[in-house]
Structures are given as structure tokens and as C-alpha cells.
């Protein structure tokens, strides 16, 4: 359970600030476009003067956007395909939950736990510091906390 005050703080303050700061960085180099996923998939190609701002704030925006997208007031079931992939990778859904919980609760300081798809199409649980997004590592996040 996450309380309403924490959710409001993350939505109205943190996420809004990441969006504003990412947009401010992008305004300095309109020639690179605005597709944050594409830009963050090759951070070395970013202009040096905005690279860290986009890593921090673009990552913060993408991480929060995925988190909000996945929230639902109703309990939902995962797809049969994802359930099978989880069983294949982790052995069981309970083992996945344990791995994900460990990733979320053992991060020192601020950060995220993710279920990602790696370039080989396999699932992994990872943890990133601060607002680092798995996209910079060539991973596709499908669950974020």
C-alpha cells in the first residue's frame, strides 16, 4: 500500500518537475527531437551540455509514466504469455515476487525496481539508482516500482 500523500507528491511534484526539466533541456537542442526513449537508448549521442539532465529528468519522466500507466483501481490478471515467461524465468510467480521485492527493498537511497525484457527477449528483475531508466542499458521496462 502506498498512501495518498506519497502518490500526490510523486505525481504533482516529482513527475511534473522531471517533465519540466526534460523539456527545458530539449529546448536547447530542438534538432535532436523529443522521443525520450530513442534519445535515452543512445545517451552517448546526446549533446554533452544536456546529457545528464536528460538522463536524470527524462529517466524520471519515463519511469513515473510507466508506473502511472500500470496503476489500476481494479485487480487485473497478467496475460497468459507473461505468466508463462515469468514461470520459465523465475520458476514461479511467487519466486518472481520475491526477486522483485528484493530489488525494491534493498536499493540504498532512492531508485526503482523493474521487470524488464532484455535484448534476447528474456525477463530480468533489476534495480536502478535515482531516476536511471533501464532504457539506457538496452532493456525494455514492463513493470516499475
Swiss-Prot record:
**What does the record give under GO molecular function?**
metal ion binding; superoxide dismutase activity
Q: Tell me which family the UniProt entry assigns to this protein.
A: Belongs to the iron/manganese superoxide dismutase family.
What is the protein's name according to its record?
Answer: Superoxide dismutase [Mn/Fe]
Q: Which PANTHER family match?
A: 37S RIBOSOMAL PROTEIN S26, MITOCHONDRIAL, SMALL RIBOSOMAL SUBUNIT PROTEIN MS42
Which cofactors is this protein said to need? Mn(2+); Fe(3+)
Q: What does this protein do?
A: Destroys superoxide anion radicals which are normally produced within the cells and which are toxic to biological systems. Catalyzes the dismutation of superoxide anion radicals into O2 and H2O2 by successive reduction and oxidation of the transition metal ion at the active site.
**Domain of life from the UniProt record:** Bacteria
Give the EC class as a word: oxidoreductase
InterPro entries listed in its UniProt record = Mn/Fe_SOD (IPR001189), Mn/Fe_SOD_C (IPR019832), Mn/Fe_SOD_N (IPR019831), Mn/Fe_SOD_N_sf (IPR036324), SOD_C_sf (IPR036314)
Please list the residues that bind Fe(3+): 10, 64
Amino acid at each position: 500500500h502506498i498512501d495518498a500523500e506519497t502518490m500526490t507528491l510523486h505525481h504533482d511534484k516529482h513527475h511534473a518537475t522531471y517533465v519540466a526539466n526534460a523539456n527545458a533541456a530539449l529546448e536547447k537542442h530542438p534538432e535532436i527531437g523529443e522521443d525520450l526513449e530513442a534519445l535515452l537508448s543512445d545517451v552517448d549521442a546526446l549533446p554533452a551540455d544536456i546529457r545528464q539532465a536528460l538522463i536524470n529528468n527524462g529517466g524520471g519522466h519515463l519511469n513515473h509514466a510507466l508506473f502511472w500507466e500500470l496503476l489500476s483501481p481494479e485487480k487485473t490478471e497478467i496475460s497468459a504469455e507473461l505468466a508463462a515467461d515469468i514461470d520459465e524465468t523465475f520458476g514461479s510467480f511467487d519466486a518472481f515476487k520475491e526477486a522483485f521485492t528484493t530489488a525494491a527493498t534493498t536499493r540504498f537511497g532512492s531508485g526503482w525496481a523493474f521487470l524488464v525484457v532484455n535484448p534476447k527477449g528474456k525477463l530480468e528483475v533489476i534495480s536502478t539508482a535515482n531516476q536511471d531508466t533501464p532504457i539506457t542499458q538496452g532493456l525494455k521496462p514492463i513493470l516499475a516500482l
